[in-house]
From Swiss-Prot:
Localization: Cytoplasm
A GO BP entry: DNA replication, removal of RNA primer
Organism: Rhizobium meliloti (strain 1021)
Protein name per its UniProtKB record: Ribonuclease H
Main location as per UniProt: cytoplasm
Nucleotidyltransferase as UniProt keyword: no
Cofactor(s) the record lists: Mg(2+)
Amino acid sequence: MKHVHIFTDGACSGNPGPGGWGAVLRYGDVEKEMSGGEAETTNNRMELLAAISALNALRQPCEVDLHTDSKYVMDGISKWIHGWKRNGWKTGDRKPVKNGELWQALDEARNRHNVTWHWVKGHAGHPENERADELARKGMEPFKKARRADAVK
């Protein structure tokens, strides 16, 4: 089974507001960079989309070390998701899970692989995390420009 390292990040200008996600995938000495964004979103949604998009880009089941600076993603995938699934994607107080469709997509994506999750401190000089952050900002930029253009009209 191939062993892939993934580094993800999300960014948002305003929360909600224009947002982007970025991911760096590394297999041996081959590296792939990905990014995307949305016009009106939240930072948490972008963090989730980064992980989902990166895992879905893998064409076959892999051993994955996924690195994120998002406590939301780390806590959700390692602590909260089991109860949400047991409760039909509802929280302990029976409310729908926020970003439930993304959590379900992440659960499906991770189940195709053997994923080990790692938390890294954001903006602390971790080169791959910094690159994922740059990619997330790049993914957000077209939506920020569109918002600025709308403000001038």
